[in-house]
Amino acid sequence: ISYSGEVADCGEVSLRRLSMRIDLLNKAEGLTITKVTFRNRAVKSRLFTPNAMLAEPGAVEDKEYPDLNLVGSFDVPAEYKSKIYGYENLSRRGEATVPTLDIEYTYLDQPYTHTVEFLDRNDPEGLAPLALKRNYLYRITVGRKVEPEFGIEVVDWTNEKSFNVDDITF
């Protein structure tokens, strides 16, 4: 309804989430994830898609997800889904707000910490941070052939279909 009271059909309205999500899957036998810390988790956003990271105080925080007990199993992976959220993080290389995920785990009864860096595979040097975009799910799978391996998969949040990062509009 307009200001003058006239009714008009504006067509379909497509809504998108303002947040992004990170899920963990542990397929590594003998490895137990005990804690996750999301470093530089964006806690503020804009209604419209920004072109750069918010540069105001309090835009990011470190958030801990303690007391996890994700026991690895190849046949039935331990999942930590729909618990880690944040807003877009468009930080560029060298900025203090580049996001990472510290995964604390035990492997063969020894404690370890692995830092997952979200890096753009299309960057020739492999050093450019991957923009964590709204409305996407970032799935981190922990596996093991000989040593523990950490892989990142970016999928559509709604239908969980894979796509190329090139397809994300910036």
Task: Please name every model-derived segment.
Residues T141-F170:
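Intrinsically disordered, low-complexity repeat and linker tracts
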Residues E12, R21-R134, N159, D167-F170:
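Tryptophan-paired
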Residues L137-R139:
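Extracellular low-complexity, Gly/Ser/Thr-rich intrinsically disordered linkers
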Residues I1-D23:
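Long, acidic/polar, low-complexity amphipathic helices and coiled-coil-like
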